[in-house]
Swiss-Prot record:
Keywords: Methyltransferase, S-adenosyl-L-methionine, Transferase, tRNA processing. GO terms for cellular component: tRNA methyltransferase complex. It holds the Pfam family Methyltransf_4. This is tRNA (guanine-N(7)-)-methyltransferase. S-adenosyl-L-methionine binds at residues 48, 73, 100, 123. The keyword Methyltransferase applies. One of its GO terms (molecular function) is tRNA (guanine(46)-N7)-methyltransferase activity. It is an enzyme of class 2 (transferase). Substrate binds at residues 127, 159. Belongs to the class I-like SAM-binding methyltransferase superfamily. TrmB family.
Length: 217
């Protein structure tokens, strides 16, 4: 990424689309730390990448009040809906970053901040010429290494088998992650079902769940 392009992207990423107490603001000058995410410090922190309509994080935040949830989402309509749900439930443990996480991720947060990171159903870019646009690659895995502590967990879901297989190979080759139990599974009960996931299940799609644990920094 050229310096000019990086500056342009940061000028976008450091802005906020509208006024809300639930926004966090990214900055190239300083990384976000646990002390300046919320009005209080939580026991653990959870990051959802591409949080969509917020239904997964909202459901988890209601059950895990001692965890701070940070959501990264770029689409304004989804962000507005999420904020309405946060307000409806009077949640003090959910904040949103209106940032494209494919631009900046490890640059935004301090190291070892999140005990868990979730990525549900990113675009699989099925055509070979588009594979370079996929989120999960060696650079992304390096960002996970920075943001997770040892024994931190990354959870991933996709309904596209070739993407699941490629993801498994990338984590295997990284040598710093290992599967939590198995390389993939076809059911997941500990994370709420999203609207997109429910739709894919109704269509009869097989969903691959991949959970990786960081074993060394």
């Amino acid at each position: 990424m050229s310096q000019d392009l990086e500056q342009k992207l940061w000028s976008i990423a450091s802005g906020i689309p509208f006024v809300s107490d639930y926004f966090l603001q990214a900055s190239p000058a300083r990384k976000l730390k646990k002390e300046n995410l919320f009005s209080k410090v939580f026991e653990t922190y959870f990051l959802e990448l591409g949080s969509g309509w917020g239904e997964v994080a909202i459901a988890m935040a209601l059950q895990r009040r001692n965890t701070g949830f940070v959501l990264m989402e770029k689409k304004f309509d989804r962000i507005r809906h999420t904020i309405r749900e946060i307000e409806k439930h009077s949640l003090d443990n959910v904040k949103i970053l209106c940032v494209n996480f494919n631009w900046f991720l490890a640059d935004v947060f301090e190291e070892n901040l999140f005990s868990e990171i979730l990525l549900n159903f990113p675009d699989p870019w099925p055509k070979k010429r588009h594979h370079k646009k996929r989120t999960i690659n060696s650079k992304f895995i390096e960002s996970l290494r920075v943001l997770l502590p040892e024994k931190g967990k990354f959870s991933f879901a996709t309904d596209y088998g070739p993407y699941a297989r490629k993801t498994i190979r990338l984590f295997r080759d990284s040598e710093i992650f290992k599967p939590e139990t198995m390389e993939f599974r076809l059911e997941r009960k500990e994370i709420p079902v999203s609207h997109f996931e429910r739709k894919k299940r109704k269509e009869g799609k097989r969903i691959y769940y991949i959970d990786q644990i960081l074993i060394r920094k």
